[in-house]
Amino acid sequence: MGEETTTAVSFRALTEADIPAIVAIEATAFYDAWNENMLRNELDNALTTYVVMESEGKIIGYAGFWLVAGEAQVTRVAVLEELRGLGLGTRLTAALVNKAWELGAEAVTLEVRESNVAAQRAYLTCGFASEGIRPNYYEDNHENAVIMWLYK
């Protein structure tokens, strides 16, 4: 695990102009990386909220959720590959959770790969608890997903 960073970061809403930078992050973060059209569809969906994390004017991460019936379902949390392991994912997750609370969520949930211990640690640091397993959840390798919840 890397050193925690004190890098100055800011958070703001994702805009269409951010999509190329997000596609680049997606390509290194997910086997099923979203393309520009998929991201535009997410931006156009009234149920979704996405935030970007910036440092020195550069997008270094992003995250989002769908808010339905008082529950925020996290869809993505990703940090630039070269900045992983520095605690930025934890900071990004905390900002996302705060946004969910602002928008009226009573709970936040997500799935994370069983092998992604670093992400699970970040979510636990933010107050999430593991509440179950979805067997064979991921299509690429049939890995289990850990289901995590955080309640207001």
What feature does the model see in each segment?
Residues 11, 85, 111-112, 130:
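Conserved SAM-binding loop
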Residues 80, 84, 111-115, 140:
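Residue-level recognition of the GNAT/N-acetyltransferase active site
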Residues 3-6, 10-82, 86, 93-95, ...:
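Acetyl-CoA-dependent GNAT
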Residues 93, 115-119, 136-141:
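Short glycine/proline-centered loop/turn elements that form peptide/ligand docking sites
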Residues 74, 108-112:
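Conserved hydrophobic beta-strand within the GNAT/NAT acetyltransferase core sheet
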